[in-house]
Amino acid sequence: MEENNIKILGARVHNLQNVDLEIPCGKLVVITGLSGSGKSSLAFDTIYAEGQRRYMETLSTYARQFVGTMERPDVDKITGLSPVVAIEQKTTNKNPRSTVGTVTEISDFLRLLYARASRAYSPVTGEEMVHYTDEQIVELILKEFDGRKIAVTAPIVKGRKGHYRELFESLIKKGYLYARIDGEIREFTPGMKLDRYKIHTIDLVIDRMAVGDSLRERLLTSLCEAMRQGKGTMAVYDYETGKMRYYSRHLMCPTTGVAFEDPAPHTFSFNSPKGACPHCNGLGEEAVFDREKILPDPALSLRDGGVEPLGKYRNNMLFAILEMLGRRYDFTLDDPVGTISEEGMNAILYGDSEPLTINLAEFCLTGGNNLVSWEGVAEYIGRTEDEDSVRSRKWREQFLVYKKCSVCGGTRLRDEALHFRIGGLNIAEVSAMSIARFSEWIADIEKYFSPKERKIAQEIVKEIRERLRFLVEVGLGYLSLARSSRSLSGGESQRIRLATQIGSKLVHVLYILDEPSIGLHQRDNERLIRSLKELRDAGNSVIVVEHDEDMMRAADYIVDVGPLAGRKGGRIVAAGSFDDILHANSITADYLTGRRRIENPEKLRPGNGKSLIIRGARGNNLKNVDVEFPLGKLICVTGVSGSGKSTLVNETLRPILSKLLYRSYDQPLDYDSVEGTEHIDKLVVVDQAPIGRSPRSNPATYSNVFSDIRKLFESTPDAQIRGFKAGRFSFNVKGGRCEECRGAGVQTIEMNFLPDVYVTCKACGGHRYNRETLEVKYKGKNIDDVLNMTVNMAVEFFANIPSIHQKLKAIQDVGLGYLTLGQPCTTLSGGESQRIKLSSELSKRDTGRTLYILDEPTTGLHFEDIRQLLDVLAKLVDRGNTVIVIEHNLDVIKVADHLIDIGPEGGEEGGRIVATGTPAEVARCPESYTGRFLQKLGL
C-alpha cells in the first residue's frame, strides 16, 4: 500500500477490538457488516471524530472555548488523514425557513437571475412594465400630447382617508396653486380641508401648459420637480379627455401608472423584509384556530367540557358570561354544543359585539350588576401568545392548525415579487417545479432573453444547471426547490448534501457517507454510484457505510466488520476488492455468493378476508387514488423515490387511524372516505428514531423489564429485612444509587481548553449503586451484575420468572441477544433501536387486530439483519395482525403477501397506483419499475 494511505492502529471505540486497518486513499471504499458490528464506530466515531478533533486543534484556545472541543477517540494512532467531511442521514435542520433551494444555494442564484434578467408585468393590466429616463419621458409626452393642454402632476396621496388641511397649508406656502383631488382639478383656498372619513387621491399640479417642442426645457424642469414630489412617479393630466397618464423612473405600468422599484436579489427572498410576505413573514403558512380541536365532541355540553379550552363548569365569571350569552342566543350550558345555532356558536368562539349585563349575585359572585364584553374563546386562547412559558405555548398550539398563508398562497413572497417573470413564470412557480422539470426548463432558457440579458445571465444559469444536474444524478429530481428541509427524510437530506459537495469541486478531501442508498429505488442506484465515483475521480477519498450489493460491486475496496454484532463483533473479518471478499469466511460473503439467501416464500398468507380501503386520496402528488389494504397480511408499499408512498401511508392512512383510535390532532391529507377501520383496534408505528436521548436510557428501561427486575430484587429476603423498596434499585433516583456520580458510574472532570474527561467513580467503582444496595443479591448476582449481563445471559438467568423472561426473550428473538441490559441507548444504531421497539411490541399481548406501520425498516441493516427482521414481522402477521412496510429492499418486497406499487415516476409524474397484488403479479406489470427488478429474481 502507498505511504499516504489512512493507517489506523489500535482502534477501541465502543466495541472495536483493538483494530488495525489500512484504507487506500483516492478510492471508493465500502465498510459493511452486521448492524451493531462496529461499522459506524470505525467510520464516524474513529476516523471522522479524529479528523474533526485535529481541525479543532488548529483553532486558538480562545476560539475553542466558544466552539467546544472534541473528545479524542480511543485509538493509538491514525496517519494519512486528510480533511474529513461527514455526510450523515440525520435531518438536523428544523428551521422552517430552510428549503431545498436554500440548502443547495440554487435559490441564491435564482434570485440573482430574476433580479438581473426578468421582466415585470402590471398586476392590473398584465402588460409589460416599462423603465424610462426623464429625457425619454419628455419625448413621449411631446409625441403623445403635442398641441394639447396638460397639467404636469405628482401623486402625493393615493387612496387614504384624512382631511389634509395641514398638507394644503404647507403646499400653499410653497407656492403651489392647484391639485387634482378625487378626479377634479381644484384651486387651493385658505383653510381648505376634505371629508376625513372618505378615501381620497390627490395629485399636486406642478405646471400647466400647451405641449409644444418650444417648451421642451420647461417640461423637463417641471417633470423633474414632479418626480421629486411624487418620489419617482409623475402623471400627465389631459384637459381634453380628462384622463391621467402615469410615468415613473422605476418600472411602471404605462396604462395605470402602477410602479415597482427596480428588483434586487432581496426582492425575491422570503428571508428578507423586502421580499417576504408581510402576513406570514415569509413562512408560507399561518396558524389558525381549528374548530374540530376546540369542539372535539359535539355531544358534550358546555357544562361537561364541550369547549375544550374552557374545560368543565366552574363557578366563575367565565361561565357566568357564557350563561348570559346563552340567554341572548337561546342555548343553555346543558345543551350539547352540536345543537347550538351557528350564530350562537360564532358568538361563543369569536365574541359578541354587544356588551352583556351580568348580575353577579345571581351567580353567587360578589358584586352587583356588571357590564362586560365577551371577546370569544379564540381571543381567550390567543392571550397566551405573549406568555413566555413553554407550557402556555404548548397549551395554545394544541388548538391550532397550520394552513397555507391566506395572503401569499404559500409562496412566502410579497405580491410585487410575483409580477417579475422569465418565460411567463415567476420565481415561486419555478421554485414549485420538480427539479427534473426545472432542469428541462432552464436548459432552454436563453430563448427568453434579449442579447443583453443573455450575456448578464450566462454565468448565473451555468451555476444553476450544474447544481441541478447533481441533484438529478443522486435521484432527487422529484423534489422541488420550495420543499421544506424539515419534511425531508434522512436519506434525502444526505443526498442533497452529497450533491452540494460534488458541486463544491473540493479535492483531496475524505468524504464519509452513511448508507446513501437509503430511500432510493433500485432503479436510481446506478446514478448514485456514478455520483460517488465522480466525487472520487475529482481527487477525493470516499468511505461509504453501506449494505447494498450494487454499491459493494462498484467499490474499489471493501472492509467487512464482524463477524457478529456487539461484543462478538468489532473485528476486521475481511478487507480487499470485491473478489477478495467473496473468498472470505464471513456472513457477508455467504450472502454475496449465494451460500446464504433469503428464500422466496413457498406460499403467501391468505389474510383474514377483510380490508382497509381509502378512497379519493389526493394529498401532495397522489392522483385521487383508491387503495385497498388487505388485512392479516404483510403489505409492502413500493415505488421510486417521491412517488407518493409516504404521502399515502404516513400522511394519509396513519393520521386517519390515529384520529379514530386515539383522538389524535394529526390532520390527514385530503381524501374522500375510509372503510374497514372497525377491523383495527390498535395502531403501532415503528421507526428508527433513537429510543432514548439520555445515556441513562437502556434496553432494560425501554422494554420496561427493569421495573420487573427491581420488583424481583425488592422481594428478596435481604431487601425485605432492610426494608428496601423497588425504587431503591433505580440508578435514577436518590436512595440506592451512588450520590457521588448520581448513578452514572463515572464522574466528569471539566477541562477548560480540552475535552471533558470521564473517570470511573471512586466511591462506587463504576457500579452506580451504594454499598448497601449492592449487598442485596438474587441467585448470587446484585443489581449491577444484572445490568452488565448480555440479553442472552439474562434469558437463562431469569428463565423461571415469566414476566421478565418473556420481555428478554422478545429482545433475543429480534437478534439483539448480544446487547447488555445496561447499555446506553445513545450508543445503539438505528437498526438496533428499531428492533428494540419491535421487541417491545412482540412482548405485549395483542388482539390480532393491530396494524403496524414501518417506514424503510431495512435502513442500516445487513442481509442477515434483514432475515431476522423478516422473521419478527412474520410472527406479528401470523398472530393475525397486519404489517404495512414502505420499502425499496427487494429481499423484503419479494416475501410480502401483497404489494402496492405507486408511480410510475416521482413527483408530479407519480401518485398513481401502478400495480397491486402478489410479488409475482406485480412482476408481470410492464409499467412497474419494481416489477422489472422482481422479474430478475425469478418471480
Regions found by a protein language model. Give the residues of each.
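Conserved phosphate-binding elements of NTP-dependent enzyme cores
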Residues: 1-939
